[in-house]
């Protein structure tokens, strides 16, 4: 029997999908700080996957993790985004800063 170690946060249906394939998996429910840290790790993982394969599905994975982080931290992302845009703008003008002289 081959055992693969993952030690990472997975989507809710992954354990059932694995078991439906006749395999066994070992999971636990992450709570509090462990869950928040694993969400941060997952955000990096999903962002890297999007970087390597920019498509709607990969970006949706990033968004799913962002939504989970927003929920566990009770952050109002729309308010934070609007504040940041009012102060510094968005990316609509597509400016690329090349240099600054002092």
Predicted features along the sequence, with ranges:
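Flexible "arm" and connector segments at domain edges
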Residues: 1-102
């Amino acid at each position: 029997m081959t055992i693969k170690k993952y030690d990472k946060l997975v989507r809710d249906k992954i354990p059932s999908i694995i078991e439906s394939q006749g395999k066994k998996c070992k999971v636990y429910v992450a709570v509090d700080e462990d869950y928040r840290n694993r969400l941060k790790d997952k955000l990096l993982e999903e962002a890297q996957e999007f970087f390597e394969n920019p498509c709607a599905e990969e970006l949706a994975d990033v968004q799913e993790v962002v939504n989970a982080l927003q929920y566990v931290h009770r952050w109002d992302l729309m308010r934070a985004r609007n504040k940041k845009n009012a102060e510094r703008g968005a990316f609509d003008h597509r400016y690329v800063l090349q240099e600054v002289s002092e």
